[in-house]
Amino acid sequence: MSAQKSSLWTTHTFLFLGFVVLLSYLTYFHHYWEPQAVFWDENYHIASAQKYLNGVYFMEQHPPLGKLLIAAGEKILHPNARADQYIGTDYATNFPPDFSFKGYRFFSAFLGWWTASLLFLIFLLITRNPLLSSFLSFFYIFDNALIVHIRGAMLEGPLEFFCTAMILVFLLLLEHRERQRLFLLWSTLLGVVFACIMTTKILGLVFILLIPAVLWKLLPDGRTIGRFFVCFLLGFLAVYIAVWHIHFALGKRVVPTLPDNGYYQASPASKQLLATGRTGSFLAFPILLRDAFGFIAHYNRGTPRLDLCKPDENGSPFFDWPIGARAINYRWETPDGNTYRYLYLQSNPVVWLTTFAAVILAICLLVGSFLAPPRQPLTHRFLLMVFTGLYASFFVAVSRISRVLYLYHYFIPLLVGFVIASLVLMEVKKLGRWNLTEYGKTFGLIVLAALIFVSFQFYRPLTYYEALTDAQFARRAILPVWELTSVHGTRTNALAVAKNCGN
């Protein structure tokens, strides 16, 4: 086994990794500042970033790390002469013609780019084959929905990076659990990346389920379990507290035009801390954190529910997400009145449908392994159980959320689905009457990678804001459930019609 592990890091491995880095640069990072126009939640996140840059106190529905990174990109690159136009509002509008998005979008696009290399390493640990790993990376590199969203000043770029990092560290921890120093390192890093997830978006809480999976592998060694918990908690608390402390320490200035005269429903104790300039004190930390959690709960209670009867509803039911429904038109414009540029959250159907099929096949493999154990047992049954359980648990969790959710909320299970697809590839030994050799799997994966690339190119205009005629747009609306609608069309959701909205 050790020889097999050492043979992973060959010249071929680094060449294929370089190939993945280059391709993902071209899809995620190249000219990420285009279009030079705001879309979707950038109005909110740029306003939040400017508050950090100007020391303005505020609270928001999401934890602070993603928005701190958006602000850091603008601080580092500094492409704009001003960074204070929107400190008096939570929703930035009327962007000047020369406004540059290069700084605000930097970290989302940058981390989105490097997520591909982390996925390559995950696939390498599973397949032990750099060629297979590079083509499996096509699932991420050429997915149109991930690309268009992550290239914006959004939270999903950092979130996907941290989630991918946690999966990678989880696999490395399991692989090196017999080597004490590496085990302690990966245990600490697991806490660090989980803290990064939880300070970016609370939706990433589902990754807490990787901890019981680690404990299961460590049983019955109570001493090792104790060391794991100590390292994990140290890593988690150090980052979690540091991120929130930076958020509180930066917010010293109250701007009265913001909600609740700039206090965002802060408690009297927090108002006193603001008045005396003590928000950076660690003694103030519990008070400010309590208020921040209270505001998150308050904000989500006020968020509307999904209403498919609304003609402008962009949300979608969670059970539609695996097949790419519903697409979202982020923005559009027409250069000449005959063609139209769209920025659309539209899936690569080959990626999403293949991933969903892999999840279904994984469930079948697991059920079959228990009900009718095959002569050759599953090689990766534990990992299949972990990641299929993670995928299913996400949907159980979101099914209990009453507020409206959107297609990009599926990005976390989609990422997990990519890992499941790699595990299924390694487990499937026969296809009908044919035995699947390693060469057969490689050939099949190359064909699939080619289909992914062709599909990516087909939907490329909707990803990179390229002009289309109405006829060209209509040819891309393959599945009605996507509701891929041109500027001249009307969204008619089949579920809403069935509910008889009274239109």
Indicate where each model-derived feature is located.
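Transmembrane-helix motifs of polytopic, lipid-linked glycan transferases
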Residues: 17-18, 94, 98, 102-128, ...
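Transmembrane-helix signature of polytopic, membrane-embedded enzymes
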Residues: 19, 82-91, 95, 114-142, ...
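Short helix- or helix-capping micro-motifs
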Residues: 20-24, 136-141, 148, 168, ...
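Aromatic-rich transmembrane-lumenal/periplasmic boundary elements in polytopic membrane proteins
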Residues: 35-68, 72-75, 240-320, 467-482
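Short acidic/glycine- and proline-prone juxtamembrane loop motifs at membrane-interface regions
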Residues: 39-40, 145-159, 200-203
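Interfacial juxtamembrane loops and adjacent helix segments
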Residues: 58-109, 308-315, 320-322, 327-344, ...
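Membrane-interface transmembrane helices that cradle and orient dolichyl/undecaprenyl
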Residues: 126-127, 166-187, 216-219
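Transmembrane helical bundles and short interhelical boundary loops of multi-pass, membrane-embedded
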Residues: 181, 225-232, 236-260, 264-266, ...
